[in-house]
Curated annotation (Swiss-Prot):
Comp. bias intervals (Basic and acidic residues): 427-445, 472-484, 494-504
Protein name, as recorded: Variant surface glycoprotein ILTAT 1.23
Function, as annotated: VSG forms a coat on the surface of the parasite. The trypanosome evades the immune response of the host by expressing a series of antigenically distinct VSGs from an estimated 1000 VSG genes.
Lipidation, GPI-anchor amidated asparagine type: 509
Sugar attachment sites: 66, 419, 509
Lineage: Eukaryota, Discoba, Euglenozoa, Kinetoplastea, Metakinetoplastina
Length: 532
């Protein structure tokens, strides 16, 4: 951006034609309007650096829930003690959510303090729907809360680092930068400027030429207000300073080149002639850049002394026969950089850059705030998720192969209405007082309903009778049970986890592990679906 503007300025220096006629009314009006546009920047609102309070509040609520779900012993470690200075580094142990003590100590202590009111943790638990949970259930919720709390802590750290690293991008600092460019360091309005501020940094001269420039010396003026004075203020030799080169209503300046004692007050009066602005929106960086370019594009070329305004000869004394202007000197090597590095231009460009950076930071802060709020919402919505997981566990428990098959067999037994057919189908006949008999599943004769094709294995098509492997005390007879089976049903082996006499070799059911793995796979799949 800066390079493009500088290139445009240099091009104008080389190409703009100079007119050495005496200054007349209205000659500098276009520059006056441009300078007024720049001065209006000082009245505009400036955007603020985005706050982090929404994200910090969300994190605080997450920690309050964490503390509320912890046991009393843990809460006591962080509870505020009346009349004693709390040491934030002496807590031992670890929270139920297994967060790092050194990094979270302050947050836990603050959470305990926030929960120290008359109602304690009841409002927090009520908000999460966890008022009546057991201690075991609290541990379950804390386990689920842990990754959320860790993620929130990491985001909060990002948020704080970003905000503290952008402390210089406040609206106050940006406004001060703009005001420095317009009126001088420390001045907040045209009428607050001083003569020394108007004369320019380090200027010990006492004439208008010293401020505005002359044939052999570049201008010392370094604020927009000083440029306004140089380009618009009249001179005593021209109708008592009443020449109106900028505005038909501008005040007269009946002062000679050597008298600048009240130049700063006259400059403020000229600023009062500027048009007002009804724009209430925050100032944008592009507006600053545009206002700068609008003025700097009007630089005129002269013989190694480019200038703004009206010039005839000698220098910018204010006389219509000499110059009402701001002049630079480009005779010696390196002097041309002054044209590209006008102090107030550089300062305003810096203010524009600060606004751009602030807007970028604000977008990131808003995003992190929203992330923390989303995590807070998730933390306080754990109950329905964990209840769903419990239901899935219960469903899986019911779906365990042995139990499921027993229920299926019970359904088959119900179809038999006679004591003569019931026992033949691995069922048993039950009667109450010798009457009202019914056919029910015989637990000692568990059968499984399979999808085997007709004729496969033993028994009827699609049905397999599960042998009583434990009844065999001989390895050979044990393994004979597998004859004709596509999958071994018995095996001479030591016990697995969950089986009795694990160290003893005996004939055992070969489907034990398959059933356990099936049940675990259902639970695992259900929990994975719950999380993702």
């Amino acid at each position: 951006m800066f390079k493009n503007i500088n290139a445009a300025v240099l091009l104008l220096i080389l190409s703009t034609r100079n007119d050495y006629a005496n200054a007349a009314a209205g000659d500098n009006e276009n520059l006056f309007l441009d300078l007024c546009n720049l001065l209006e920047l000082g009245k505009r609102a400036v955007s603020k650096l985005a706050p982090t309070n929404l994200g910090e509040l969300a994190y605080s609520e997450i920690q309050k829930l964490n503390m509320s779900l912890s046991d009393d012993a843990w809460k006591a470690k962080f509870a505020p003690k009346k009349g004693k200075q709390e040491n934030s580094n002496n807590a031992d142990g670890a929270p139920r959510s297994q967060e790092k003590t050194h990094a979270r100590n302050h947050a836990w202590r603050q959470a305990a303090t926030d929960l120290a009111g008359d109602e304690g943790d009841k409002p927090t638990l009520r908000l999460a729907g966890l008022e009546a949970v057991t201690q075991v259930e609290k541990l379950q919720y804390l386990s689920a809360l842990q990754p959320l709390a860790e993620r929130a802590a990491a985001i909060l750290e990002q948020l704080k680092t970003l905000h503290s690293g952008s402390a210089g991008l406040t609206d106050t600092n940006i406004r001060q930068e703009i005001q420095t460019a317009l009126y001088g360091t420390g001045a907040t309005a045209p009428e607050k400027t001083t003569l020394q501020l108007l004369k320019g940094k380090g200027n010990v001269g006492s004439t208008r030429k010293d401020i505005c420039g002359q044939d052999n010396t570049a201008a010392k003026a370094d604020t927009v207000l000083a440029y306004l004075f140089c380009i618009c203020a009249g001179h005593a030799t021209d109708s008592g300073g009443a020449i109106k080169v900028c505005s038909q209503t501008q005040p007269a300046n009946n002062k000679a080149d050597a008298d600048v004692s009240d130049a700063h007050t006259h400059a403020a009066a000229l600023a009062g002639q500027c048009h007002g602005s009804d724009t209430t929106n925050d100032i944008k960086a592009a507006e600053i850049d545009s206002a700068i370019l609008e003025f700097t594009s009007k630089l005129k070329a002269a013989n190694q002394k480019p200038y703004f305004g009206k010039y005839s000869a000698t220098g910018c004394t204010g006389s219509d026969a000499e110059g009402i202007c701001v002049m630079f000197k480009t005779t010696a090597k390196g002097e041309g950089k002054a044209v590209k590095q006008i102090p107030w231009v550089l300062t305003l460009h810096n203010a524009a850059e600060m606004i751009r950076k602030q807007q970028a930071v604000n977008g990131k802060i808003d995003s992190l705030n929203q992330e923390l709020q989303a995590i807070q919402t998730a933390a306080y919505a754990l109950k329905p998720q964990l209840e769903m997981y419990k239901r899935l566990q219960q469903t899986t428990e019911k779906a365990r192969p042995g139990k499921q098959l027993t229920e299926m067999q019970a359904g088959e037994c119900n179809t038999h209405k006679s004591n003569s057919t019931c026992p033949k189908n691995n069922c048993k006949w039950e009667e109450k007082d010798g009457k009202d008999g019914k056919c029910v599943a015989d637990d000692s004769k568990v059968t499984t309903q399979g999808n085997a094709p007709a004729g496969a294995g033993d028994g009827t098509a699609g049905t397999t009778t599960t042998p009583n492997c434990a009844s065999h005390t001989d390895k050979t007879k044990c393994e004979e049970e597998n004859k004709g089976k596509t999958t071994p049903v018995c095996g001479w082996r030591k016990g697995k986890e969950g089986e009795s006499d694990q160290d003893k070799e005996m004939c055992r059911n070969g489907s034990f592990l398959a059933k356990k793995k099936f049940a675990l796979s259902v639970v695992s799949a259900a929990f994975t679906a719950l999380l993702f």
